[in-house]
Amino acid sequence: MDMDSILLDAEERMEKAIAALEREFSRLRTGRASASLVDGIKVDYYGTPTPISQVASVAVPDSRCITIQPWDRNAFSLIEKAILKSDLGLNPVNDGKIIRINIPPLTEERRKDLGKMARKYAEEAKVAVRNVRRDANEQLKKLEKNKELSEDDLRKAQEDVQKLTDRFVAKTDEKAGAKEKEIMDI
């Protein structure tokens, strides 16, 4: 592996850390209904943990309601239990044909908790980015040790890796700030 491919690999892996952060953020509840809120919830469907979207259709008729229409009558109670077990603080209402989830406005306390969760997810993404930096630097040092890279090139490559890291850490902070602002907006 040469210096350029190590840098490209590091950038790709850092992009994946940001993408994972965005997925986590999409599951964090804000004041609005969103189908992605229930994406992470798994239903114990015939003994197999299955995403809700694979056993029912999920719709968002308005900004305060999510509707879930199971394709199998046996799935109603399973979906209801899975939603109640999730730590989203949602209360499903089952009328026999459809499961409705009304999204209540967030309390100040719940907003603060969600803000903390957003910061935690952002910190995990930063740790992932820094781990990628460490791996890239180790690979670069191996190249230098094997005389495939000069000391000057090593230093320059490590500076490039650090610039990449700084850019992705800043991106993480930016996304975390935007998500916290979205959570705190009433």
Curated annotation (Swiss-Prot):
SUPFAM superfamilies given in the database record: Ribosome recycling factor, RRF
Keywords: Cytoplasm, Protein biosynthesis
Subcellular location as annotated: Cytoplasm
Chief subcellular location: cytoplasm
GO term, biological process aspect, one: cytoplasmic translational termination
Entry's Gene Ontology molecular function annotations: ribosomal large subunit binding
Coiled coil segments of this chain: none
Keyword Protein biosynthesis applies: yes
InterPro entries registered for this protein in UniProt: Ribosome_recyc_fac, Ribosome_recyc_fac_dom, RRF_sf
Tagged with keyword Cytoplasm: yes
A GO cellular component entry from the record: cytosol
Cited function: Responsible for the release of ribosomes from messenger RNA at the termination of protein biosynthesis. May increase the efficiency of translation by recycling ribosomes from one round of translation to another.
Family: Belongs to the RRF family.
PANTHER family given in the database record: MITOCHONDRIAL RIBOSOME RECYCLING FACTOR PSEUDO 1, RIBOSOME RECYCLING FACTOR
Name under which the protein is recorded: Ribosome-recycling factor
